[in-house]
Design a protein with these regions (language model features):
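Domain-level signature for proteins that mediate thiol-based redox and metal-cofactor handling
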Residues: 2-100
Length: 100
């Protein structure tokens, strides 16, 4: 199956928007769990977004990029949804650190 570059870019953009929307809905899924299981989290997505913007000459701050991914200011999201990491989560994160 051959997909032209324009269509591929549109499909990738739609997939990214769907992923971001899914993560906004799944506030029960903590970033540390994402990091431990998949090696990335919402903060990683926002950093990659900011880096991609910079490659195109678009200046975005970390807070601006995080708001794009979180759908609200990061501090607000943390207050509403972030839970204290358990000792087990912290240990798993430390053990997987070289993979991040």
């Amino acid at each position: 199956m051959a997909i032209d570059d324009k269509t591929r870019t549109e499909l990738e953009a739609a997939t990214f928007r769907t992923l971001v929307a899914h993560l906004r809905e799944r506030t029960d899924v903590q970033n540390i769990d994402l990091m431990n299981l998949a090696g990335f989290c919402r903060n990683c997505l926002s950093r990659w977004y900011r880096e991609a913007a910079a490659e195109k000459g678009v200046s975005l701050s970390d807070p601006e990029a995080r708001e794009i991914v979180y759908g609200m200011p990061y501090d607000e999201w943390r207050k509403k949804h972030q839970k204290e990491a358990t000792p087990e989560q912290k240990a798993a994160f430390a053990a997987s650190q070289p993979k991040h």
